[in-house]
Structures are given as C-alpha cells and as structure tokens.
C-alpha cells in the first residue's frame, strides 16, 4: 500500500527519520518491478543494480523507497574525479592542543559501512578501475573492508545496504549516447545479486507523472498538451532506435518541457529551448516534423533551417 503496488513482502523500516533520509515526494509513481527489486534489497540485504536510459528516475526510485522506509540514503556519483582516497580515506594534518599531528580521516565508504545507511553508487559504469576494485571488496553480503594503512577490518552494519545505477549493463556502450562509460569486470557484475531494468514508461504512466509534477497542466486541456509531449518523446525514441536521430527525449526532458511551457506560456518556444537547440542541426527538420505531427502546428522556419556559410 505504501508504494501503490500489489505485493506481499515484509520490509523493515525505521520509526524515525534522520538528516540523511530523503524527503518524500508525494507525487512519485512507483514502477512495480523496480520497486520489488529495491524492496528485496532492503529486506534481504541483496546488492541491487538498476540499469536504464538516462532520465528514467533510477536514483530517485531508490531514494523514494528509502524515504518511505525512513532509511538513511547517501548517493555517490562515480565520475572520473572520484578516487580510491575519496572512498577509503586519507591521512590529514590536524591541529590538536596547538600541535600539528597526522590523523586518518575516513572516506565515505567506511563511514557508511558502520551505519544503517543505503549507499547508492550513481553512474556505476563510469567509475575508474581502481575505484571499482575497492567497491568489489564490499559487494559480498558480509563484505568486510580492510584498511591496510590502519591495520583495521571494518564489518558492515546489519542494516547497511548497497545499490547502484547505470546506463549500460556493464558491457560497454554501443549506442554512442553514453560517452565515458566502460565495460565492467564480469567478476564484479557477478556479485550484484539483483539487476533490474527501468526504461521508458507507458504513455498513460508518463502522462500521469508529468501531470503530478506540473499541476498547472492537470486539467482536460493541459492533459491534451502533456499527451502530445509524451507522443513527441516517443517519436524521438522510435527515431533513435531506427537510426534517424541521435538524441532522445527522456521522461526528465518531458517534465522540463512542461515546466518551461508553463513559464513561457508557449509550447513551441519551450520545445526549442528545452530540446531542439541541443540537437544536431541536420536532424532538426526531422524533429520539426515530429512536433508538427503531435501538436498540429509548424515550428518557426528560423528554428529549423541550418545556416550554411
């Protein structure tokens, strides 16, 4: 009932929140299969990875489940600047009683391991190899972390949980959409006990989510506009699969389009500044045709034509 889906599972929860518990979004709509995977992770200490296209709400999904369980949640973005030192910790010079001394400052991983925290590694397939091997140590359920510099072994808290999100499934990117991602060691992928896929939603679900996120459009006329926006997004997704265009509208893009349409009072202009202007100029006539098919009006000529000098 808490998640609006029909499943019979007992999941532990905390009676009180803390500063690390995400805020509840009352408009959030849960995907049944993804929610089931995340709840299994919380209830049975499974290592859960959620894979899917950008903007589908993978990280938010984990956060919103954690929010309703009052479970502290910490997200770490595995960009190329996150290093082994950031995760494990380092020696730092500190002042104590007027003297400079060297003291070990633990990183985010030892800190989280010792606490009832759900740790989420975002952009998991973009992590550096040295960072990935640190994570591999704690992927087992009893995953103890050995700090060699400190001669210390950290045992995970009984309510520590580990999640990850990725655009690819560890086999690299063949679409060209996700530069910076890389193949993941299959011995490491084997340690993720549940891998869920969260891709684009049905037209009805996506329309309901956008109407909930942008209440100004939650009436008969507004819903017609939202349905046209979702239809346009689906055309870009079909066009991408067919190889006609190289950029797709994610659910996040559609929400941004609706928000900008509310700000400007003009869907045509909102579409141009939200999506069209970041697309390849050669592909803009195709996108203009998609727009015309969904909204029944032409985009301004100057927004489409490519200037040849």
Specify the residue positions occupied by each region the protein language model found.
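AAA+ P-loop NTPase catalytic core and its hallmark functional loops
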Residues: 1-223
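Alpha-helical lid/collar subdomain of P-loop NTPases
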Residues: 1-18, 35, 202-207, 211-309
């Amino acid at each position: 009932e808490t998640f609006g889906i029909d499943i019979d599972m007992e999941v532990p929860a905390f009676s009180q929140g803390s500063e690390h518990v995400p805020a509840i979004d009352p408009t959030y709509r849960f995907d049944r299969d993804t929610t089931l995977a995340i709840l299994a992770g919380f209830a049975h200490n499974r290592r859960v990875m959620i894979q899917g296209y950008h903007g589908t709400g993978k990280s938010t999904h984990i956060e919103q489940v954690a929010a309703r369980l009052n479970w502290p949640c910490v997200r770490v973005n595995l960009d190329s600047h996150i290093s082994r030192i950031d995760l494990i910790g380092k020696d730092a010079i500190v002042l104590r009683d007027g003297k400079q001394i060297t003291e070990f400052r633990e990183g985010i991983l030892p800190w989280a391991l010792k606490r009832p925290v759900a740790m989420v590694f975002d952009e998991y397939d973009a992590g550096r190899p040295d960072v990935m091997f640190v994570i591999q140590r704690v992927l087992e359920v009893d995953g103890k972390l050995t700090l060699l510099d400190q001669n210390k072994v950290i045992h995970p808290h009984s309510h520590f949980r580990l999640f990850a999100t990725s655009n690819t499934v560890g086999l690299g990117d063949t679409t060209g959409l996700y530069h910076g991602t890389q193949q993941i060691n299959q011995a490491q992928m084997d340690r993720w006990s549940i891998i869920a896929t969260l891709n684009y939603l049905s037209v009805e679900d996506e329309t309901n989510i956008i109407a909930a996120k942008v209440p100004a459009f939650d009436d008969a006329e507004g819903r017609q506009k939202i349905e046209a926006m979702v239809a346009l997004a689906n055309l870009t997704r079909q066009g991408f699969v067919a190889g006609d265009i190289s950029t797709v509208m994610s659910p996040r893009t559609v929400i941004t389009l609706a928000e900008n349409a509310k700000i400007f009072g003009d869907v045509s202009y909102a579409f141009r500044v939200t999506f069209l202007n970041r697309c390849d100029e050669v592909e803009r006539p195709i996108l203009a045709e998609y727009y015309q098919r969904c909204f029944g009006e032409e985009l301004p000529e100057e927004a489409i034509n490519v200037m040849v000098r």
